[in-house]
Swiss-Prot record:
One of its GO terms (biological process) is cell division. PROSITE patterns: CLPX_ZB. The keyword Acyltransferase does not apply. Coiled coil: none annotated. Component of the ClpX-ClpP complex. Forms a hexameric ring that, in the presence of ATP, binds to fourteen ClpP subunits assembled into a disk-like structure with a central cavity, resembling the structure of eukaryotic proteasomes. GO terms for cellular component: HslUV protease complex. This is ATP-dependent Clp protease ATP-binding subunit ClpX. ATP-dependent specificity component of the Clp protease. It directs the protease to specific substrates. Can perform chaperone functions in the absence of ClpP. ATP binds at residues 122-129. It comes from Pseudomonas savastanoi pv. phaseolicola (strain 1448A / Race 6) (Pseudomonas syringae pv. phaseolicola (strain 1448A / Race 6)). Transmembrane segments: none annotated.
Length: 427
């Protein structure tokens, strides 16, 4: 609406030429040649421009595919160690999106196939973090599915098509964006066949799920209910082509190392048998590096499913040194996160070296890998984070080994006084 009324100097109200609000309804009214615009309309215009710029930047960055070395370098900023897995993932992801960029070119005789990825590694070794970081780096939709909740269609549980629906939700049901996304299916080892022999009874959460995932991973057109799902059954289903969706499956595969060792150490019997001591046994990570498709079949994955995951990357168990690095070095390291939380209260947080070693040792004892580090720190810092917001004179908190072990409380350093002696926790 264009306002043609006289200005305030003539005793009349001024109105925004865009939304029609008077000068009393808004905080600010900016005058131009015969027009006015309010602060609310300016904010709205800024939001529209910002969204369009972000979309244009995302589109241009999608065309600028980083090289495998650049991908691996960015992964180094967030994931400690696992160099072999990073290299395998970087090459696989680079080739996948290079293939997508090639598909629009006409008169191309060679059709490039899709290479989905299988990550094998102990709990807390960084499988999910690697997949999340890749998706963030490439600016593509990403979703995580839990294989343990999946069942065959018609049974209680989630259908495999629900995975695609989650991916659509991540990109506001933009089918074109979803068709270039990444899906990470966790706990894939939990849907292994319960025995080597085909069972007479139906295995709806094991082999049945593998069969259901086959076509989805290889490439099919999945029918997914739109927003609202069953609430609006009259709506047409969305058709999502999964041929260009990159599937990354991950699992701990506990016991797989024994299958590999049995295969690799198979030898003669009697006098021809090679004698080995228990000390000569390989570590889990070393054994997993020698995995072959047949080992996965013996573990319980069906051959057709293994064939759909041609790229194999194994992750090593994290030792104490790696866990200490994880605590301190990545961009989003846990010690940096907690230091930021304390900084918001105007307090410095310091972790002594012996404290970091103690945290790493406790995580190793729990066999939770890097995933257990946060729960340990959360338990140690809980009381301090509860008290600090109520105390305005604390300038620094120091955590040492005795605090992690539970034999003393964190050392609080006050602004204008000597720090009090540490007090043992109440019995």
């Amino acid at each position: 609406m264009t306002d043609t009324r006289n200005g305030e100097d003539n005793g009349k109200l001024l109105y925004c030429s865009f939304c029609g609000k008077s000068q009393h309804e808004v905080r600010k009214l900016i005058a131009g040649p015969s027009v006015f615009i309010c602060d609310e309309c300016v904010d709205l215009c800024n939001d529209i421009i910002r969204e369009e710029v972000q979309e244009a930047q995302a589109e241009s960055s999608a065309h600028k595919l980083p090289s495998p070395k650049e991908i691996s370098g960015i992964l180094d900023q967030y994931v400690i160690g696992q160099e072999r897995a990073k290299k395998v993932l970087a090459v696989a992801v680079y080739n996948h999106y290079k293939r997508l960029n090639q598909r629009d070119k006409k008169n191309d005789d060679v059709e490039l196939g899709k290479s989905n990825i299988l990550l094998i590694g102990p709990t807390g070794s960084g499988k999910t973090l690697l997949a999340e970081t890749l998706a963030r780096l490439l600016n593509v939709p990403f979703t995580i599915a839990d294989a343990t909740t999946l069942t065959e269609a018609g049974y209680v549980g989630e259908d495999v098509e629900n995975i695609i629906q989650k991916l659509l939700q991540k990109c506001d049901y933009d089918v074109d964006k979803a068709q270039m996304g990444i899906v990470y299916i966790d706990e894939i080892d939990k849907i292994s066949r319960k025995s080597d022999n085909p069972s007479i009874t139906r295995d709806v959460s094991g082999e049945g799920v593998q069969q259901a995932l086959l076509k989805l991973i290889e490439g099919t057109v999945a029918s997914v209910p739109p927003q609202g799902g069953r609430k609006h059954p009259q709506q047409e289903f969305l058709q999502v082509d999964t041929r260009n969706i990159l599937f990354i499956c991950g699992g701990a595969f506990s016991g797989l190392e024994k299958v590999i060792q049995n295969r690799s150490t198979r030898g003669g019997i009697g006098f021809n048998a090679e004698v080995r001591s228990k000390e000569e046994g390989k570590k889990v990570g070393e054994s997993l590096r020698e995995v072959e498709p047949d080992d996965l079949v013996k573990f319980g994955l069906i051959p057709e499913f293994v064939g759909r995951l041609p790229v194999l990357a194994t992750l090593d168990e994290l030792d104490e040194a790696a866990l200490i690095q994880i605590l301190t070095e990545p961009k989003n390291a846990l010690t940096k996160q907690y230091a930021k939380l304390f900084e918001m209260e105007g307090v410095d947080l310091e972790f002594r070296t012996d404290a970091l070693k103690s945290v790493a040792r406790r995580a190793l004892e729990r066999k939770t890998g890097a995933r257990g580090l946060r729960s340990i720190l959360e338990g140690v810092l809980l009381d301090t984070m509860y008290e600090i917001p109520s105390q305005s004179d604390v300038s620094k908190v120091v955590i040492d080994e005795s605090v992690i072990d539970g034999t003393s409380k964190p050392l609080l350093i006050y602004e204008n006084s000597e720090p009090p002696a540490k007090v043992a926790p109440d019995a």
